[in-house]
Regions:
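Short acidic, glycine-rich surface-loop motifs adjacent to enzyme active sites
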Residues: 2-22, 49, 212-227
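Hydrophobic faces of well-ordered beta-strands that scaffold small-molecule active sites
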Residues: 6-8, 43-50, 76-77, 110, ...
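Alpha-helix-loop-beta-strand connector modules within alpha/beta enzyme cores
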Residues: 24-46
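Preference for extracellular/luminal or secreted protein segments
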Residues: 28, 37-38, 58-330, 334
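Beta-lactamase-like hydrolase cores
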Residues: 329-364, 471, 476, 494, ...
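Active-site-proximal loop and beta-strand segments within enzyme catalytic domains
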Residues: 363, 378-514
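Short beta->alpha transition motifs characteristic of CBS
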Residues: 368-377
């Protein structure tokens, strides 16, 4: 029971070790007297890497290994010379400086640890589905939650964050640092128009930024290892201060919070955000926090900028009414099942049901699937893009008719193989009787793509509306609004239905988009509910 192991760092702790600058990893008072005796820690004790300068400067290779073992460590990591280290320890054992009990103590602890993890009955790791086993969705969700709760708003003048009134904002993005900020920019663009701006000359950059009323700066540094440089260059500091002096700036640092130590004054920055890492997740979440799709709750883990911002500091911002982005499993859905949508979309394009598709799935305020397929037209000159804008139409079919049908199918009230003649007996004697619900919804019902109903309301000579069909005022006889100050007579819906009933079916059974089934489905749903 209890903690299985600890690692002792190469720290200088004068209150526990009297020798000047002596590393804790070689200190018997710290490891044996305090950790093992006073605190009664019985787990494995690891050294930090013995090739690090924090310890290697205190002795020669091999001798360091001996000192580490004598101090009370069980496992010595990254010895500079394993062979010499073993020789030193063995000589000390044979000379009596290391007792049998001391050696056996560590050996038994190591053997017990191996037994605990099953190495006494070793079985190779099963590599089948290894990537899926290691890339668990619950781990992704946990990492996202940790990052979201860590990201810290250090400064937020005039409640700049979250960014509101987007119609009044003209926003530029300036990238700094030596690592990529592509994910950050891509996520920012999901909320509004963002213009990336760059120039090799500071004066040129300042001129370009004059047309914008908000500048988002992303400082991106590699975090592939902890030893990568994380600071601003002198040039970047000059540019940063000049941009902030002439523009409203939101600075985002995707690096250690200590990066901000180099900034002498924050007076010209509207907001400052620390993202801690330059990972994909950190960039995505930071962008969402800027626009209020997610709240900011993070606090600084260290004091920075000469304690101007202390440990525990951090402004909290509210979530506003905007969609966030995340994993399907975070809202109770499956990414594996959603991946099947790719096949459906690709099939529709390959079969020329449509030249292109943009598909988005959102649940509980979170977008969990968003992909583009194909092109704008069959000529394939322009690919579908996330930045495309669409005319929104035909919403009644998907917002009213389809959900009601889905509910009826789900509870077993209707079946996708039910025929129109059975759903609506009045169509039993028509050529539409045997059309199934599945065929109607998938546009394989052999119905005409459309029927120009409006033509029967126009004068055949003048091509103008016939007065008996329309009125400028709404009434019981004319209740259907067509346009401003134009209302259609109520009984014209009977004409529409009769035209559909009388229409011929297409000879070939293949995909043909048609609105006509939804006239039937409207009748059915109104009769059912």
């Amino acid at each position: 029971n209890g903690l299985s192991s600890v690692m002792v760092a190469h720290l200088n702790v004068p209150s526990l070790e009297s020798r000047t600058n002596y590393p804790s990893s070689l200190s018997k008072p710290i490891i044996t007297d305090l950790l093992k005796s006073k605190l009664n820690f019985q787990g494995l004790i690891f050294t930090d890497a013995l090739d690090m300068k924090g310890v290697s400067n205190f002795s020669v290779p091999g001798e360091i290994d001996l000192q580490a073992f004598m101090a009370g460590n069980d496992v010595l990591l990254m010895s500079e010379n394993v062979e010499i280290g073993m020789e030193k320890i063995m000589l000390s054992y044979y000379s009596g400086h290391i007792s049998e009990d001391r050696l056996a103590h560590s050996v038994k602890k190591i053997l017990m640890a191996k037994y605990k993890v099953g190495l006494n009955n070793y079985k190779p790791v099963e590599t089948k589905n290894l990537v899926a086993d290691l890339s668990r969705s619950k781990d992704d969700i946990l990492y996202s939650k940790l990052m979201q709760n860590a990201i810290t708003v250090v400064k937020n003048n005039n409640a700049t964050l979250p960014i509101k009134d987007l119609e009044l904002k003209n926003i530029a993005y300036v990238e700094m640092g030596d690592s990529s900020g592509d994910t950050f920019l891509k996520t920012l663009k999901k909320y509004t128009k963002i213009t990336p701006v760059s120039d090799n000359n500071l004066d040129g950059l300042i001129r370009k930024l004059k047309q914008f009323n908000l500048v988002i700066i992303g400082f991106h540094k590699s975090n592939s290892t902890p030893w990568k440089p994380y600071k601003f260059t002198n040039k970047e500091l000059v540019w940063l201060h000049e941009i902030a002096r002439t523009n409203e700036v939101v600075l985002n640092v995707f690096s250690k919070p200590y990066t901000l130590d180099a900034i002498k004054s924050f007076s010209n920055f509207e907001s400052v955000v620390v993202g801690y890492q330059n990972s994909r997740v950190a960039q995505e979440l930071t962008a969402q926090i800027l626009f209020g799709a997610l709240p900011a709750t993070g606090k600084l883990p260290v004091s920075i900028s000469n304690s101007m911002y202390k440990v525990g500091h951090g402004f909290e911002t509210s979530k506003i009414d905007r969609l966030s982005y995340g994993n399907p499993e975070s809202v109770g859905m499956s990414r594996l099942k959603l991946s099947k949508l790719d096949s459906v979309a690709n099939f529709a394009i390959e079969d020329e049901m449509t030249p292109g598709i943009q598909l988005l799935v959102a649940r509980k305020g979170k977008v969990i699937y968003n992909k583009n397929f194909g092109h704008h037209t069959y000529s394939k000159q322009r690919k579908v893009s996330f930045e495309d804008l669409y005319d929104v139409a035909s919403l009644t079919k998907i917002l009213v008719t389809l959900p009601l049908l889905m509910e009826l199918v789900e509870n077993g009230s209707v079946n996708l193989d039910d025929r129109l003649g059975d759903l609506l007996p009045k169509y039993k004697t028509t050529n539409k009787s045997d059309i199934t619900l599945k065929e109607m919804l998938s546009h394989f019902a052999r119905l005409k793509p459309w029927i120009p109903f409006y033509k029967s309301t126009l004068d055949s000579v003048t091509n103008t509306p016939i007065s008996k069909f329309f009125s400028s005022k709404k009434s019981k006889k004319y209740p259907i609004q067509i346009s401003q100050n134009s209302f259609l007579r109520k009984d014209f819906t009977d004409t529409i239905h009769q035209n559909i009933v009388d229409s011929e079916l297409l000879e070939e059974k293949k995909y043909r988009y048609s609105d006509l089934p939804y006239y039937f489905l409207k009748d059915f749903l109104e009769s059912y509910y």
